[in-house]
Amino acid sequence: MNFYRSSIISQIIKYNRRLAKSIICEDDSQIITLTAFVNQCLWCHKRVSVSAILLTTDNKILVCNRRDSFLYSEIIRTRNMSRKKRLFLNYSNYLNKQERSILSSFFSLDPATIDNDRIDAIYPGGILKRGENVPECLSREIKEEVNIDNSFVFIDTRFFIHGIIEDTIINKFFEVIFFVGRISLTSDQIIDTFKSNHEIKDLIFLDPNSGNGLQYEIAKYALDTAKLKCYGHRGCYYESLKKLTEDD
């Protein structure tokens, strides 16, 4: 596990049975530790994101391409001008072309010439707003990011996966809770209704049986875990997200 003081992992371990062995997956900018638990008692801290790994009816995994790279968001967010410049000059290859152009003009600096166009991918989800529960948060985020109504989404709440994400570029840690789910739509139907927005530029669909990269590794761990027996769970097997929202 990452050397990070988690805000909720001690409570998760205390009240939820571990379902599968932890794994670590990483690339050139992130190290992610994943641990699956039987859903016996889960609540989410305000700084913990909730995300859904969703399969379409044509057996594709839905993934969102962020409009802004993680690095660009951090450079814009930080108030320390020296840190802004350092991140830009040292890691400009983790920006997309438009971001590099914008920041070059802003700082009047030219980093080393880079041709790549960075794309950061995520699963739909986000942080709970005040007064929201997990189903409400997922419903809102999936609608905002992907334009899918919660009546088309079904979530397996028998288990969840706790993730610690270390961003080695900006030197920060993040926590996320993943759920597995299904969408009663094909990938083509989802693309037809999707509208590019301020958070998500476009969508991609992964083959759950073959692939590479962090999003594929996360999905494979989640889908393999879904096949295990979740004895003692207090959730549901692919319950309608709309019904979960109404029940809570």
From Swiss-Prot:
Mn(2+) binds at residue 145. GO terms for cellular component: host cell mitochondrion. Gene3D superfamilies: Nucleoside Triphosphate Pyrophosphohydrolase (3.90.79.10). Residues 45-227 form the Nudix hydrolase domain. It is an enzyme of class 3 (hydrolase). Its cofactor is Mg(2+); Mn(2+). The keyword Chloroplast does not apply. Mg(2+) binds at residues 132, 167. A motif (Nudix box) lies at residues 125-147. InterPro entries: NUDIX_hydrolase-like_dom_sf, NUDIX_hydrolase_CS, NUDIX_hydrolase_dom, Vaccinia_D10_decapping, Vaccinia_D10_N. This is mRNA-decapping protein OPG122. Belongs to the Nudix hydrolase family. It comes from Variola virus (isolate Human/India/Ind3/1967). Pfam families: NUDIX, VD10_N. Keywords: Host mitochondrion, Hydrolase, Magnesium, Manganese, Metal-binding. Its EC number is 3.1.3.-. Decapping enzyme that remove the protective 5'-cap from both host and viral mRNAs to commit transcripts for decay by the cellular exonuclease XRN1. Preferentially targets spliced mRNAs and since all viral genes are intronless, it preferentially targets host over viral transcripts. Acceleration of the turnover of cellular transcripts promotes the shutoff of host protein synthesis and therefore diminish the magnitude of antiviral response. GO terms for molecular function: metal ion binding; phosphatase activity.
